[in-house]
């Protein structure tokens, strides 16, 4: 069985950095295989041959069962150390500007801001999260730019 998540051309404030990450979903991440609304984050290389983009890689299984990958850098902040993290609700939230990105179906659109008890919840980011190609074949989920 082969699943491919395609990436269309778009302009991003996140620079192009090398991306190469292979995850064995049978031996290393067995609970991630065939799951829904689960996330893995990689802020550091696992192996010497890995490349994790500009700010790290967020790998996500969508509500539709698809595999998706995003750069963890917030496109509004555009700095490698200001990251988004999954919140368990099909969203990723920027640690700094608090913009919420909808990752539930692999798009990464900004939808608002997490600001409890504050009136302004307008998203600061006007770009989607930078997406990477996620290809699943056999037991291996491959992430590439």
Can you name each region flagged by the protein language model?
Residues 90-98:
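Cysteine-rich micro-motifs
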Residues 7-87, 102-106, 130-145:
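N-terminal pre-ligand scaffold of iron-sulfur
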